[in-house]
From Swiss-Prot:
Subcellular location: Secreted
Species of origin: Tapirus indicus (Asiatic tapir)
Name assigned to this protein: Apolipoprotein C-IV
Cellular component, GO annotation: high-density lipoprotein particle; very-low-density lipoprotein particle
Signal peptide segment: 1-27
Keywords linked to the UniProt accession: Lipid transport, Secreted, Signal, Transport
Amino acid sequence: MSLPGRRASSLPSLCFCVLVLAWAVACQQEVPAGSPSPPPEPASSPWGLVRSKVKEFLEPLVTKTRERWQWFWDPGAFQGFVQTYYDDHLRGLGPRARAWLHSSKDSLLSKAYNLCPQLLCGDRDQG
């Protein structure tokens, strides 16, 4: 199967995205307990098969990932991560940004002055 304007190498990514989208739609269609349930979709229908296969494949993966990252969502661990990130990257950002802007402005003005003919800009030492 060839899609117009697409390379064959993008086809697996497209198929994966379609499968994930189908799984997400199928999961959203599940109704909460207590409400009347729609008639079950026959497993032999094409979308029923896709839904069951995708769910069968992704459910263990999602569960395993959720269990592995549970420590990260603990308030203490998350707060520690944010504090460390702030200490490493954001502390003193204001003064560093001002210094960078000042040096960039000076550098840009110097380059512009060097490009300007002396007749128009005058002597650099005077201004």
